[in-house]
Amino acid sequence: MSSTEYAYAVANVRARESELLDNRFFNQLLSGTSFEEAKRMLIDKGFSEFENTSDISAALKNYMEETWEYLQEITPDKNVLDFLVVKNDFHNLKALTKGIMTDTDGIKYCLKPCLINAENILNAVKNKNFSDLPSWISECAKEGYGLLSSSMDGQLFDMFVDKCSLEAMQKLAADDFSKKLADSFTALTDIKIALRMARAGVNEMLYDYALCECDRVDISELKSAALKGYGNVVSYIEETEFSELAEYAAVSAAEFEKNSENYILALLDNARRISFGAEPLIAYYAAREAECRNLRIAVSAVHIGLPAAAAKERMRELYV
């Protein structure tokens, strides 16, 4: 599809960018003296859901779903954005499979937007009709079910499905920018996992369940470094294109994770400046996702009386 076919969609997103919350607003939100004051600020910004509830999750439930529906309406090629939300389908697969195993309701833990109706995943797994699911998730659903039913190890199951999620994201990434973004995200996730596993001194087998192949890191070398210790992973990072993040990894895995997300947002910040193509739409969705995450942190902080400085340490950069 020609990039010029995105001209209308890009112009539409440009107009919407002015509605994104900026750092100034978040500073005001965190400086509020009460949860009720924070709610009023959000209601004034258009978050009418806060008028009827103090449940942060409930109020923000439709936040990203509305963003997704809007982008689907204006995007010439509906599939080009699929790689952005496929992680929710794998989250839903985890919730539903565990629900089946424990005879509990997994549906209530499912996320939207997603590519597959959660009920369809539930029926496929419950009836073991895994082939009813799209190819990018069917084998994972089958193997994951077998893994969980035989081991009843929820952590191992989570690792396996999360790896499958990264593989699917790379598979569904359609254009050069999407492929770069998906591969970079996978590489940074692999490094984050290696840092945490190295610190914990986990069994070597777990690395094979957790690390996902990608172009920007060699997972065999990363695994080898992690097995030698945390500091060796930091040294490995210094030899990759993510060398600028090594100093944060030296502080902690959490500090690396925060700054790796900011690294991805920097890629997206450059992408949104492109005049034609899907890149600005991808960047807009990611910006809304970062905004949503920061909202949860900020509103929760005000609700429980967490100091603003502590909340800001957990928040991610915004591109507005």
Per-segment meaning from a language model:
Residues 1-320:
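N-terminal domain-start signal
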